[in-house]
A protein has these predicted regions:
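Structural alpha-beta junctions
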Residues: 17, 21-24, 285-296
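Structural signature of tandem-repeat unit edges
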Residues: 52-67, 77-90, 100-113, 123-136, ...
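Short, surface-exposed loop and linker segments with low hydrophobicity and enrichment for Pro/Ser/Thr
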Residues: 40-42, 73, 237, 257-267
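Surface-exposed receptor/substrate recognition regions of extracellular proteins
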Residues: 1-62, 66-67
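Consensus positions within tandem repeat domains that build extended binding/scaffold surfaces
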Residues: 70-74, 92-97, 115-120, 138-143, ...
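Short, aromatic/basic amphipathic alpha-helical patches
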Residues: 256-260, 277-289
Length: 297
């Protein structure tokens, strides 16, 4: 039975590799493998398509590899260490998804792109430093990395993508660089361990559910650059007692009255004294009129 399972897994991996090379998700019968392999398009052989031995505990990616393909190491649940060479510039979607035992990874300075769900479900990861040349972090890139306690986001990033760090329950603090202009929906949703968030001075949009269920947050400062706050952006942050808008020159748009639902009963929203009346009367803000207080800088 074990031998049959091993053969089945092997054939599945071969099919996955062929489909990745072709860029086609159409199922491939095992009987067609010889024809499919012969007809594979020529191209860049520096792309690591798939790890055939899914039971490997360690792997060193060959020097000269420039891209780690989509799902290359997905579900390699026993993989504990990986060496990525300095030639790699791109980590594909789901490349290391659900590598539960992977405890650390060093992303080389050569990498510029981290694909969607690249490290999703890597519950053993405790810290990640994203290199300064990375300009794109995909959707759900680090989703459900529950063991992650620290993350360094470089200044090269301009947007925190949807669910990028969703359910990273071990994260205690995060600093969003000044070049970031948007925090997309559910970016830090359910990061229950977060106690400190620093939002950069270029952020204009805080998306839907961006910090929902961040139950460890007690206070947060929203920079004056923010013009829009989405649905349930801070909903169910049950210990949130202070939100500071004191550097704002205008009232930001609140997408819905639920933006701060189920926060602390003692929540105080600090705004510039000169804008208190306007703030209390603004659409959707009026729901929180009794929590809005004016402060002088």
């Amino acid at each position: 039975m074990a031998r049959t399972d091993t053969l089945t897994n092997f054939l599945t991996d071969v099919a996955t590799a062929i489909k990745a090379k072709k860029g086609d998700s159409t199922p491939i019968p095992a009987a067609n493998f010889d024809t499919e392999i012969t007809n594979l398009p020529s191209g860049d052989d520096s792309i690591l398509i798939s790890l055939i031995d899914r039971t490997a505990t360690s792997f060193e990616i060959p020097e000269g590899t420039t891209s780690i393909g989509n799902s290359a190491f997905e579900d390699c649940t026993g993989l504990t260490s990986i060496i990525i060479p300095g030639s790699v510039t791109s980590i594909g979607g789901s490349a290391f998804e659900d590598c539960y035992d992977l405890t650390s990874v060093t992303i080389p300075d050569s990498v510029t792109r981290i694909g969607s769900s690249a490290f999703s479900g890597c519950i053993g990861l405790t810290s990640v430093t994203i290199p300064d040349r990375v300009t794109y972090i995909g959707v759900s890139a680090f989703y459900r990395c529950t063991g992650l306690t620290s993350i360094t986001i470089p200044d090269s990033i301009t947007s925190i993508n949807r669910s990028a760090f969703n359910s990273c329950t071990g994260l205690t603090s995060v600093t969003i660089p000044d070049r970031v202009t948007s925090i997309d929906s559910s970016a830090f949703d359910s990061c229950t361990g977060l106690t400190s968030v620093t939002i950069g001075n270029s952020v204009t949009i805080i998306g839907n559910y961006a910090f929902r269920d961040c139950t460890g947050l007690t206070s947060i400062t929203i920079p004056g650059s923010v013009t829009s706050i989405g649905n349930y952006a801070f909903g169910r942050c049950t210990n949130l007692t202070e939100i500071d808008f004191s550097t704002h020159n205008a009232v930001p748009t609140l997408a819905n009255t639920n933006a701060f639902n189920n926060t602390s009963a003692n929540l105080v929203i600090k705004v510039p004294s000169a804008l208190v009346d306007e703030w209390k009367a603004a659409t959707n803000w009026s729901t929180y009129a009794d929590k809005i207080v004016g402060v002088r800088l």
